Structures are given as C-alpha cells and as structure tokens.
Amino acid sequence: MSNVIVFGGHGKVALLTTRILSERGHTVTSVIRDADQSDEIRAHGGEPRVADIQQQSLTDFAELVRGHDAVVWSAGAGGGSVDRTWAIDRDAAILSVQGAKQAGVDRYVMVSWSGSQLDHGVPQDDDFFAYAQSKAIADAVVRDSGLQWTIVAPSTLTDDDATGSVDWDGSSTEVPRGDVAHVIADVLETPGTAGNTIRFNSGSTPVADFLRADAV
C-alpha cells in the first residue's frame, strides 16, 4: 500500500478520494489550510497536515511531499478572486510539481478539467479566463516535468450519487464528484495511466475498464 499526500484536502473530491484510498489500505496525508478541518479529515480516514499553500516556497513543498509515494493536487481557488486563482491554480500547483521532483516523489496526479488546454478559447475578459489559463499552464508543466504524471480531467462536477462508471463519448457533460474520486484512486493503482490525460464524464463503462483502455 502507498503513502499519498493530497493537496486541497478539505475539498469535496479530495475528501471522497481520501475515504476511498484509506478504505483500500493506503495512508493519506491531507493538506489543509484551517486546523478546524482536522476532525473531518480524520473522519474520512486521512491524517491532516496544516499548511497554507499560498505561502509555501519550493523548499516548503518539497518538505511537505518528501517521504510520500504519490502526490495528488486537488487544490483550487474555488471561484475566489482572480489573484487567488492565479496564486493557487497556477503558481502553487507548479511549485507542487517542482517540489515533488526535488523531493524525489515520482508519482504525481493533477486534478484538472476536461477543457484544459493552452488553446482553450476563453476570452481574456471572461471571468473564467484566469482559471482556464491557470489550469492549462499548470498542466503543461506537469507534462514536461519528467515525473510519472497523470492528469485527471473530468467535465462539470455534480453532487449526484457516484455510479462507478464513466465515459468520454459526448453523451454527458457532467460527472459526480464521487466518480472523480474513484478515478483518482484507481489511477494511483494503475501505473499504466502514467503519461496520460484522462478526460471523462458520466457513462456506462466501469472505471477500471475505462482506465485500462486509456492506458493501452
């Protein structure tokens, strides 16, 4: 079993991922900003680590991830200010990648979104631009990192019940957060997904089968 560190540990997807991983026997360290969230992290099977990712240097990130087998980046500004979006979704994300490399943690999973690409087409005067551009830049850094990376790129998230099945066939534009968590957990247990961007939404293909096909 592996020792995984999850950034953005109090987010909905991260909490669900922590529960799945802990139930499968993995050890999960959840990085959170607020110590008051610690009890909820423990209730989901994780061990809280309090750190403000906006204030961490490269050295700080390297020390946070050192000793773990894998990094999951599930942090985000969550619709905050533009400055905070750049600071978390781009700058802190990039530092986490560089920190993993510096610390010798080879496995890295970035939680992104299905539209993330440098030619995303979002106008600069659109409120969504900072997020779209931040994710595209961070994902590009992940791909060029030399790490054993996987980018998990779901479509629009919902709080519907998880189904355990996904697809990428245009039949849906949404996916439950629980299924995203399932994909993240299975990606960590499927080495063949390294070097791939996994785009998906709700569907009828069991997650394990979907990932095996994507990893071919």
Q: Model-found features: residue ranges?
A:
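Glycine/proline-rich active-site loop of Rossmann-fold NAD(P)-dependent oxidoreductases
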Residues: 120, 159-164, 187-196
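NAD(P)H-binding glycine-rich loop region in Rossmannoid oxidoreductase-like domains
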Residues: 30-95, 99-102, 189-192
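Alpha-helical substrate-binding/gating segment
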Residues: 176-216
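Flexible, glycine-rich beta-alpha linker
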Residues: 118, 150-169
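N-terminal Rossmann NAD(P)H-binding glycine-rich loop of SDR-like oxidoreductase domains
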Residues: 2-26
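Substrate-positioning beta->alpha
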Residues: 93, 134, 152, 170-186, ...
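Conserved Rossmann-fold NAD(P)-dependent oxidoreductase catalytic core, especially the SDR/UDP-sugar
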Residues: 7, 27-29, 35, 77-144, ...
